Amino acid sequence: MAVEYFQEKLNKWRYSPVAGSPDEEGGNATVKPKASFVPVYAGLTIISLITVTVSLVHLLSGTGTTTTFPPCKNPAVRREWRSLTSSEKQNFTQAVICLASIPSTWQPNGTIYDDFAILHGGIGSWCHRSASFLPWHRYTLVVFEKALREHCGFTGQVPYWDWTLDWMNLANSSIFNSVDGFGGDGDRTGQEVVGGGRCVIDGPFAGLQPILYNHTYVRHCIARGFRDGDQAGRISGEYYRPESIGGILRKQSYVELVREVEIYLHNPLHQGVNGDFLAMTAANDPLFYVHHAQLDRLWWRWQQESPDLRLKEYHGKHMYNSTGNATLDDILMYGGFAEDIPVSRVMDTKGGFLCYTY
């Protein structure tokens, strides 16, 4: 019964519109798969959802770990996409394409790249609207970066997209360049594929074929459908004004910060890009990683303002369905795809367990 419950939840989940926005009432696109598809009951997200069911049993009993790590000596530096050289950009995009060709070692279908979307659509869905939103995604980026290195010879770090540089016209950002970016909007002359999106036909990721959209097995192209209210082809940048970011970073408590980062910075881009980006399997679109790296960077900036306090500040409810207050001993779960770890290990990006900066 629990698995069916999680399936139903995952199928219905969409990124929540910002309160008071034009999208608040019924603004999320519905799934309209046009490719051939079958239910996923044969084993795809069932694996991750069963993992959630089992893992939730020990969710609230932290390990009480006292493991400490010395500060890293030479932290890697994550950089903004535009600051990378052409060869560095190609190193990243080719590694992503490579990962989408490596058979999964976690489930019988798809690739390791698909595994990340399944992970996010399963366990990751329970980390939204909760304290674990930022630390869970922080470590997911590290695991993704490690996979790119180990399987595909990636030599850099996951870059971030600073959308404040593009807030006046997000859809025209160089991140969507077809030559050295992520490709642009979906083909407006094509048919709708998933999530109100159409196939991306330009850029390095035009050939990717993810296998899942939410809980439905549907091999499809990467789909996007830029929309700002009634205007197709646009993405609202109102929430990405530099002054808006500054206001969020001035929040004094972690509870306030994580809530506003998710609602006002995370969700609007998912709603504006649409397609794959609209669902909990948003990691189908490589844009997911540079978007979340920017969110992680903002958390890092907030922590650096008062490191003695904020490198240990973790409050709220640990996961979406948790009761009680979150603690640093709470576990970030990855269902065997990566090591389950206490939150404390990822609070400091230069704490030894992690070793990077921005």
From Swiss-Prot:
Its pathway, per UniProt, is:
Mycotoxin biosynthesis
Q: Which UniProt keywords apply?
A: Copper, Glycoprotein, Membrane, Metal-binding, Monooxygenase, Oxidoreductase, Transmembrane, Transmembrane helix
Which InterPro entries did the record assign?
Di-copper_centre_dom_sf (IPR008922), Tyrosinase/Hemocyanin (IPR050316), Tyrosinase_Cu-bd (IPR002227)
Per UniProt, where does Cu cation A bind? H128, H137
List, alphabetically, the GO terms of the cellular component aspect.
Answer: membrane
Required cofactor names:
Cu(2+)
Q: Where found, per UniProt?
A: Membrane
Effects seen without this gene? Decreases the production of ustiloxin B.
UniProt membrane topology term: Single-pass membrane protein
Q: What is its main location?
A: membrane
Per the record, what are the reactions this protein catalyses? Answer: 2 L-dopa + O2 = 2 L-dopaquinone + 2 H2O; L-tyrosine + O2 = L-dopaquinone + H2O
Positions binding Cu cation B in this chain are H266, H270, H292
Q: A Pfam family name for this chain?
A: Tyrosinase
**Listed name of the protein:** Tyrosinase ustQ
Q: Please tell me the species this chain comes from.
A: Aspergillus flavus (strain ATCC 200026 / FGSC A1120 / IAM 13836 / NRRL 3357 / JCM 12722 / SRRC 167)
